[in-house]
Regions:
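Bacterial N-terminal signal peptides
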Residues: 4-19
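Active-site acidic/histidine proton-transfer and metal-coordination neighborhood
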Residues: 16, 93-94, 102-196, 299
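Histidine-acidic metal/acid-base catalytic patches
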Residues: 26-39, 51-58, 148-155, 176-308
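Hydrophobic faces of well-ordered beta-strands that scaffold small-molecule active sites
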Residues: 37-43, 68-70, 94-97, 120-126, ...
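Active-site mouth loops of central-metabolism enzymes
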Residues: 39-52, 71, 98-102, 135-143, ...
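Active-site beta-loop-alpha junctions enriched in small/polar residues
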Residues: 43-46, 72-75, 99-102, 127-131, ...
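Catalytic domains of carbohydrate-active enzymes, especially glycoside hydrolases
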Residues: 53-76, 95
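Active-site-adjacent beta->alpha loops and helix N-cap segments on the catalytic face
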Residues: 76-83, 175
Length: 308
């Protein structure tokens, strides 16, 4: 996609103005877990009611969400424009788009949709996979290969001011240390519009070192998606839980707040349930957790919310 010098300059200006790391700036009026900072996630293919664009946007507005991260499947592609129009009608900001893993025709189509609807600064969430590397040479080659792949997406996204967010989804790519190596290599190439979106539901094996990982990710962190977290939940049928029902939820929220990071907070459905019902449940759980953040009792002594 060739946007020309003028469009590219405009996109670069948008990137500078609303770049991915601006949210780390101090702001005395900022409230990390306020409704205005929340993002609805995993509610398009994950929705028992199979809402269309208008129903979905109306539901988000009714629940008080002002931001949305768009995930999709092949059947949703014909409705891309309708989705953008519905979001605009209901005053919902498109924060992020679940993006193809390489720069293919579908990726070009998405950037064209963003351009057509004058949407700048939309995060592109890109996942990866891969087994563990076996030695230093293997690691170096893997980092270079993944950096090449991400660069193919990041450079065409820059004219629209869109940052690419590396999305942890398990495997080698889902380890923050590896993502940070990819980002460092890209920065050495002059590619600076790449950050991280961290998903708790894909981080069960990382919770014990979460504060350490959070500190390292913080300069590059674009968003955090919350989830009800219990030890080993991914191995015991509790991969996805409503907020407040996980034993680790309060401790993790305290870690996030204590880090000083500022940025969007995602609430997800990611189940076959009605998206509205699960979002309501997460909103309720988050509200009750926030009320306990300053409770002097250790998180381990505060009982999780009962399940439905």
């Amino acid at each position: 996609m060739h946007l020309g010098i003028t469009a590219a300059a405009a996109g670069l200006a948008a990137w500078i103005a609303c770049g991915p790391f601006e949210s780390n700036a101090a702001d005395s009026a900022y409230s990390l877990f306020a409704p205005t900072n929340l993002v609805a996630w995993c509610i398009v293919p994950f929705d028992a009611k199979k809402r269309g664009p208008e129903e979905r946007a109306a539901m988000l507005e009714h629940l008080g969400f002002s931001q949305f991260a768009y995930d999709y499947r092949a059947e949703h592609i014909p409705g891309f424009d309708a989705e953008m129009e519905a979001l605009k009608r209901h005053h919902i900001r498109l924060l992020a788009w679940w993006f193809p893993t390489d720069f293919n025709d579908e990726a070009r189509l998405i950037l064209d949709v963003l351009k057509r609807h004058h949407l700048t600064g939309v995060q592109l969430w890109v996942m990866g996979a891969g087994g563990a590397t076996t030695n230093a040479g293997d690691q170096k080659a893997r980092v270079a290969s993944e950096a090449d792949r991400i660069e193919r997406i990041a450079r065409p996204a820059l004219p629209l001011g869109s940052p690419v967010a590396l999305y942890n989804h398990g495997g080698w790519f889902g380890e923050p240390e590896n993502q940070l190596e990819i980002i460092a290599l890209l920065q050495s190439r002059g590619v600076t519009n790449v950050g991280i979106v961290y998903n708790l539901h894909h981080g069960h094996d990382q919770v014990k070192r979460f504060p350490e990982l959070l500190a390292r990710m913080k300069p590059h962190l674009l968003a955090i998606n919350l989830n009800g977290m219990t030890p080993g939940g991914d191995k015991t049928g509790k991969l996805i839980l409503p907020l407040g029902q996980g034993e680790l939820d309060l401790e993790l929220l305290r870690d996030i707040r204590a880090s000083g990071w500022h940025g969007p907070i995602g609430l997800l459905n990611h189940t076959d349930e009605d998206a509205e019902s699960r979002l309501r449940e997460n909103l309720r759980g988050l509200e009750q957790l926030v009320q306990q953040l300053d409770n002097p009792a250790p998180a381990s002594e505060i009982k999780p919310l009962p399940s439905r």
